[in-house]
């Protein structure tokens, strides 16, 4: 089977969205299929990655490295970023210009290869539009629309962007042969626009060897990996609960919080400023190693956002460290932690509850306990096993047999 993957995030990008698509490419190739990738890059070039041909197409407007430099240097109002922001408002697609170049590359590859399957992934909109245009222009293939994030249901989008995305969402889910997403609640959202019933849940998963040996730090240490969002994801209640516990003498005064990878300014209470370590972003393999240097791994999930497993949650699963999730106790993260026995959930608005759960994690550290994880349940969430779900599904598709 010949497979074309169209996506904006791929190696060497250090992001969960890239890791998901890399897993599709890697495990499809290992299953004996020919895999070609068209993705965003710093230059127009072709490289070999894990046996896959990867065609990088440079965005004429703004590259990822340029955007990262602007964010790091606090350059918000530069011409290219302003133009990119206008594109998002006018077209609902910040990769509007890139997609014209990428379509030409994808079309030329279709002419040469006659792909059996095309997998496109959102966000941004561009990969789906390229796949849709390929189909409209007569290329025959089985189209998998990977919706790793919400489209019109996203709480991160403005009302104008939501209105702009709805017709695209309807067009994509109805034109594709299979819609894939990371959770059943998200699939349910996409079904409201769809005339067919071809939907499949493929979670993000983890892709490293599980770790059973547990090392306890000399001082109680909690860690958060990733970045916060000024409006939607805040550590304020975590900090407040932590601060109160230290004041009350319930936690040792030398207890630590490590924040690894956050790019936004944080308001750390002065009384715990010396307890909070801010560490710049690191590559994924280093993040996994650093997670072993914590006693509790923290998830803070977006207030009001339903049905989404934050990608770091799966990386946390195989570390054998307790996971503390500040999120909706009725949502999917809570269900996953209960199923795998890997940690605890508390509502992010419940300060008293957060304090109680921090103390529970502290007790585990103090008594050098290890949670009785259900490793069989956890192993189903390796990226390899999640990709196998899709491979098994495709093996039964009549169009491909």
What is each stretch, according to the model?
Residues 215-233, 239, 386:
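Conserved donor-binding/catalytic core segment of Leloir-type glycosyltransferases
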Residues 23-24, 100, 104, 126-129, ...:
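Membrane-proximal helix-turn-helix segments that form the acceptor-binding/catalytic region
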Residues 40-101, 109:
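A conserved catalytic-core segment of Leloir-type glycosyltransferases
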Residues 185, 202-205:
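Carbohydrate-associated surface elements
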Residues 177, 291-308:
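Acidic donor-binding loop of glycosyltransferase active sites
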Residues 251-255, 261-288:
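Nucleotide-activated donor-binding/catalytic signature segment of Leloir-type glycosyltransferases, i.e.
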Residues 349-353, 363-396:
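A charged, aromatic-enriched C-terminal amphipathic alpha-helix characteristic of glycosyltransferases
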Residues 1-62, 178, 187, 245, ...:
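N-terminal subdomain of nucleotide-sugar transferases
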């Amino acid at each position: 089977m010949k497979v074309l993957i169209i996506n904006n995030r791929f190696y060497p990008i250090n992001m969960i969205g890239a890791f998901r698509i890399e897993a599709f490419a890697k495990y499809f190739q290992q299953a004996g299929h020919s895999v070609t990738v068209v993705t965003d890059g710093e230059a127009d070039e072709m490289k070999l990655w894990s046996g896959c041909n990867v065609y990088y197409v440079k965005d004429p407007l703004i590259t990822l490295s340029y955007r990262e430099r602007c964010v790091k240097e606090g350059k918000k109002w530069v011409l290219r970023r302003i133009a990119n922001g206008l594109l998002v408002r006018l077209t609902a697609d910040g990769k509007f210009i890139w997609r014209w170049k990428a379509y030409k590359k994808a079309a030329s590859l279709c002419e040469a290869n006659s792909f059996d399957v095309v997998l496109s992934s959102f966000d941004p909109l561009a990969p789906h539009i390229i796949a849709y245009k390929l189909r409209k222009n007569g290329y025959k293939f089985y189209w998998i629309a990977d919706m790793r994030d919400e489209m019109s249901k996203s709480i991160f989008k403005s009302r104008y962007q939501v209105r702009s995305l709805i017709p695209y969402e309807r067009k994509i889910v109805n034109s594709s042969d299979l819609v894939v997403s990371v959770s059943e609640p998200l699939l349910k959202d996409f079904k409201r626009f769809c005339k067919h019933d071809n939907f499949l849940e493929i979670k993000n998963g983890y892709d490293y060897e599980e770790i059973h040996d547990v090392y306890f730090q000399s001082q109680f240490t909690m860690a958060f990996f990733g970045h916060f969002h000024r409006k939607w994801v805040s550590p304020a209640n975590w900090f407040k609960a932590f601060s109160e516990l230290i004041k009350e003498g319930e936690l040792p005064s030398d207890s630590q919080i490590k924040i690894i990878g956050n790019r936004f300014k944080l308001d750390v209470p002065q009384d715990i400023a010396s307890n909070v370590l801010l560490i710049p972003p690191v590559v994924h393999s280093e993040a996994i190693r650093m997670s072993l240097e914590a006693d509790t791994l923290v998830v803070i999930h977006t207030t009001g956002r339903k049905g989404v497993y934050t990608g770091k949650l799966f990386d946390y699963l195989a570390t054998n460290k307790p996971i503390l999730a500040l999120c909706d106790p009725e949502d999917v993260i809570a269900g996953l932690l209960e199923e795998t026995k890997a940690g605890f959930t508390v509502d992010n608005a419940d300060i008293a509850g957060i304090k109680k759960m921090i103390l529970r994690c502290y007790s585990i550290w103090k008594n050098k306990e290890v949670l009785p994880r259900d490793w069989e349940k956890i192993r189903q969430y390796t990226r390899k096993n999640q990709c196998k779900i899709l491979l098994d599904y495709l093996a039964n598709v009549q169009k491909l047999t």
